[in-house]
Amino acid sequence: MAFLKKSLLLVLFLGLVSLSICEEEKRENEDEEEQEDDEQSEMKRGMWSKIKEAGKAAAKAAAKAAGKAALDVVSGAIGEQ
């Protein structure tokens, strides 16, 4: 009977150690995945900020060109009178 108790305790102990190791590896994998997700979202944020800046620059250039064209039209109309 004592032999069975010792064997059972040994099996339980080894099972707990194995479970602990598995949980630790699982946590490490989750941390790695989270870090990869953070890097990807950071890259996306950087890409979107560049697109946003390019859009602002294009809008500014278009507005400037439209303003200049309108000024030329008004100047031409005033010059004709």
Curated annotation (Swiss-Prot):
Residues annotated with Isoleucine amide modification: 78
For this protein, the record's InterPro entries field holds: Frog_antimicrobial_propeptide
Secretion signal span: 1-22
Which residues get removed as pro-piece?
23-43, 79-81
Q: What is its main location?
A: secreted
Keyword list (alphabetical) reads: Amidation, Amphibian defense peptide, Antibiotic, Antimicrobial, Cleavage on pair of basic residues, Secreted, Signal
Q: Where is this region: Disordered?
A: 24-46
Keyword Nucleus annotated: no
Q: Where is the composition biased (Acidic residues)?
A: 30-40
Spell out the GO cellular component terms annotated for this protein, sorted alphabetically and separated by semicolons. extracellular region
Q: Where in the cell is it found?
A: Secreted
Q: What does the entry state regarding organ or tissue expression?
A: Expressed by the skin glands.
Cited function: Has antibacterial activity against Gram-positive bacterium M.luteus NCT C2665 and against Gram-negative bacterium E.coli K12D31.
- What family is this? Belongs to the frog skin active peptide (FSAP) family. Dermaseptin subfamily.
Official protein name in the record: Adenoregulin-related peptide
